[in-house]
UniProtKB/Swiss-Prot annotation:
Listed pathway(s): Purine metabolism; XMP biosynthesis via salvage pathway; XMP from xanthine: step 1/1
Keyword terms of this UniProt record: Cytoplasm, Glycosyltransferase, Purine salvage, Transferase
Gene Ontology biological-process annotations: purine ribonucleoside salvage; xanthine metabolic process; XMP salvage
Cellular location(s): Cytoplasm
Record-listed E.C. numbers: 2.4.2.22
Protein name: Xanthine phosphoribosyltransferase 1
Domain of life of the organism encoding this protein: Bacteria
Subunit structure: Homodimer.
Family from the record: Belongs to the purine/pyrimidine phosphoribosyltransferase family. Xpt subfamily.
Cellular component GO terms, alphabetical: cytoplasm
Length: 190
């Protein structure tokens, strides 16, 4: 997605060889027009996949996921990273390691928001090592439902996430694929 790549080049900051800061339009301040366009790209790519729900992991995946769900006229479910007292234990849970934060968390899905016949589209802001996406997929599989695909806003292609997901048979569609990060340098996959 050329517009997204341009925004990354104009406003993104490569803080290191693995960390890209895009907080001016994606994960702190959000550009709703850009998120709408991102939703359009995901809707168009996954339109033949018979999606029944859009899932995302709190919190930075929410904006692109809600725009995708809105355009597909589907419900969106937010997978929780922290235990909630209102879920009352009627949940699916899996442990996920956060690459960004360097810690483990319990990814949680209420059983009432997924059915065996669901065909789930997982949307996330970043793909690096693939741990978050795999965790979301584990919850979907535990419920007996199917992962129809994974929509990623920004993929760090130099990390193993895509290969791990594709090796497990998932259809991964990324809007911006980064080949290399260095302090002050961002290069895309050609």
């Amino acid at each position: 997605m050329e517009k997204l790549q341009n925004r990354i080049l104009q406003e993104g900051h490569a803080l290191s060889e693995t960390v890209l800061k895009v907080d001016s339009f994606l994960n702190h301040q959000v550009d709703p027009d850009l998120m709408y366009e991102i939703g359009t790209y995901f809707k168009n790519y996954f339109k033949e996949h018979k999606i029944t729900k859009v899932f995302t992991i709190e919190s930075s995946g929410i904006a692109p996921a809600v725009m995708t769900a809105m355009q597909m006229n589907l419900p969106m479910v937010i997978l929780k990273k922290q235990a909630s007292k209102i879920l009352n234990g009627d949940v699916y849970q899996t442990t996920v390691h956060s690459f960004t934060k360097g810690l483990d968390y319990e990814l949680t899905l209420s059983k009432k928001y997924i059915a065996k016949e669901d065909n789930i589209l997982i949307i996330d802001d970043f793909l690096a090592n693939g741990e978050a996406a795999l965790g979301a997929a584990r919850l979907v599989k535990e419920a007996g439902a199917k992962v129809a695909g994974m929509g990623i806003v920004i993929e760090k292609s130099f990390q193993p996430g895509r290969k791990m997901l594709e090796d497990k048979g998932y259809d991964v569609y990324s809007l911006a694929r980064i080949a290399k990060l260095q302090k002050g340098l961002i290069e895309f996959v050609k």
